[in-house]
Amino acid sequence: GAALMTGATLSYRNFENSYDDLDNNKKLVAISKATLEDLGVHDFIEQDRDAAGSSDIGNVSHACPTCYIELDTNANPPAYAHNEDFLKCVTGPLAYHNLAVASKTMAYSALQVLLDPSIVE
């Protein structure tokens, strides 16, 4: 508006690639959440809130079906990625257990997609 009112021109360019919004595949999310719940995980963080930070997973999600789920760390005090308190959540026996659960979830979800062609439709 200001450029138009003063007769000035404005030009700009991005100095790096932009991050696209996340296009989460609803079917994959539902399958993965159900699998996580079967494995005893119930602390999901809802995706309708504004996320802090940025990621290229949004770009990926526009190129292929993507499933992105955030889980609560249940840490006290709360721990968020990229801060020192988060290190306690990603080291030690609990971290290895969570890695095993995540691996099982991805494998079982992929198996369901392969065995049920209606999911891909």
Question: Where on the chain are the PLM-derived regions?
Answer:
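Metal-dependent amide/peptide-bond hydrolase catalytic core
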Residues: 1-121
